[in-house]
Amino acid sequence: MPLSLSSRVREELAKETCEKLSTQHQAKKKAKAIDRDFFLSVLGSSATKREARSYIQNFKPPNTAPTKSKIQESTQQNSTENGANLGSIYTATRAVAESPKFVQQPVLPKPAPEGPLLHVALVKIRAPQLLDDETLSGIGKTLSRLSRLGLVSTVVVDGDDGSDTFLRISNCEWRNMVKEQAARVVAAIDASGTEARLVDNVIGIAEDGSNFEQRPYLKGRVHVTLRELLMTPLRRGVLPIIPSIGHTDITQTVVSATANDVVLALTREFAGIWSSESPDEHPNVVKERLQALRSEVSLDRLILVDPLGGIPASDRKNGYHVFLNMEQEYELAKQDLINRGGMHSVAPQKPTLPEASANFTVGDPILLSSFTENKPGELDDSPPPQNGSPAKHDPRMKFHLENLELVRSTLSLLPPSSSALITTPHEAANSEKQPEFKAAGVGTRRQRNPLIHNLLTDKPAFSSSLPVGRLGPMDKNEPISSSTKFAPTTFAKHGMPVTIFPDPKTTPWQPPIAGVPQISLTDPQIDLPRLVHLIEDSFNKKLDVQHYLRRVNNRIAGVIIAGEYEGGALLTWELPPGVPDGSEESRKRMVPYLDKFAVLKKSQGSGGVADVVFKSMVRDCFPGGDNPVNKWYFERSRATLKLSDTNWTMFFTTPEENMDHQTFKDYEAVCKFFGRENVGGYYQQGKRGIYVLDSE
């Protein structure tokens, strides 16, 4: 009997050991699978060496080990306080050390030891109740990968699906639905290996009648009540999931808030813009506290996951903005949405819930059935209104307009390095799976997750200056088509202004007319020394300024400057050899030639400076260079030609239907002349390219 009992004990122990080993093996297998998915998604982002270096520089953990000088300084301070070689025998007692000190000025608090800077993304997911578990799981995996790459997300759940659901159910049922969807998001992130937490008590709402001063951007009725409810999980790598509900400040009544107001409140909190300070506080104390808040966290990204996708654009045949330079394009994009939505410049009303009291406006109900005839992210193919003709009401534009306003308001509160991304749930859930389509021609690319790609490169998945036919999606063997549709994702930055001389809105760029004065580089509007520095810094070559001015001053078509001379382009009108200058046919046969295209070295590969300049050329200056040949130029050209008997390549953007034999010969003649004469003012080594421009 004892033998039988001991045998059973050994058998049970062996079985338990096997189960533990099996569990450990399964855990290791799962961890390896997660690592594999993670590395595949990162490698699939196709970041260049320059982009990878920039990412590592921004997201590498700080060196927290104390330096030798700091250790010596601390030692000297202790020895001074204790006396020379006396140790701690004669140190001041605790009572003396903590006794009040009478000083004339307030004693500033000692700064707390700095921890690593938290890089945060603010994510808003709209209408998660419309998403199946697989898509939501994919979004959870993406947010988990962002966290592993150093970008921790704070997620706001928006239950507004555009229907009249909140009018047909009670407020309690609505809140429960939003919390239920927030719990689904938590479960999706937890399943991906990253911890998430539901935080439904962090948003406060100022009540009606309270002594409250509303300030655009800087103050709102919706605010964060306790910062540590956000920062504690973020420091531990836990993702806070916040439903769009809040508590009133005085009565602590649970009410619903618009998700956009919650996003703005979180933005203000992370940016350290609004915190409850006493009017009696010393300004230096306030300054120290704000600096401490801003050194603790950096809000790097605003990510809007919306069933409708990015911001639509009527001037792009693919239908969407790829990149929005908010400083330059916000008003144009806003007016375009108003026209397409049939709003006629009426300010949009935000859809809200009735229980939000008089602080919020209840918008007109928008039936989901009114815009679900198209798949999420698709737009109506009907053309935009022309010549002031009334457009049919499109309720989808209301959501796009709110997203555009939210992006602008958020980026206005953040440093220029911050950016925003608007994409569809399908794109946000995209991982390393094989793409359903492939791009065509020289622009062939693998399908990428826009969130991962944007974190590593600070760029959109596709360049905004690429011709539509290079963007995909289409089969490799399918011809390039101007009607090509692609993933509706919009990347936005606060950006920079673009200055064009002369302004094409008032003075269209046209070939010079005899007797009419032309713009020159010595014009007072143009800062010639800064322009020369831009060209020399970009090409790392010295420019013969006087020789260059003699050649171009009578032939300048225009100058484009991005920001504070961070990038620019100079275009000239050129004649094919053999055509007499000043003749009747000379003006008709003049070729628009991209003479210089330059970007400061510090701005190359980031910020979209080159795309901003290039897009201004083809869109604003010619609506409807002497540089090394690279893929960037090849991708943006309609076609290229290797010039015979030279080491030059000609690029041109003229559509095939507008290219007759004579125009093509004129292009070729001008480019051959420039290639042989090298009239650019300095020499370039290796392969070379010349760009001629025409209407898109």
From Swiss-Prot:
Its EC number(s): 2.3.1.1
Any GO molecular function: L-glutamate N-acetyltransferase activity
Predominant localisation class: mitochondrion
Protein name per the record: Amino-acid acetyltransferase, mitochondrial
UniProt similarity note: Belongs to the acetyltransferase family.
Location relative to the cell: Mitochondrion
GO cellular component: mitochondrial matrix
Protein keywords: Acyltransferase, Amino-acid biosynthesis, Mitochondrion, Transferase, Transit peptide
InterPro entries: AceGlu_kinase-like_sf, GlcNAc_Synth_fun, Vertebrate-like_GNAT_dom
Catalysed conversion reaction: L-glutamate + acetyl-CoA = N-acetyl-L-glutamate + CoA + H(+)
General function of this protein: N-acetylglutamate synthase involved in arginine biosynthesis.
Pfam families (UniProt xref): NAT (PF04768)
Keyword Cell cycle among UniProt keywords: no
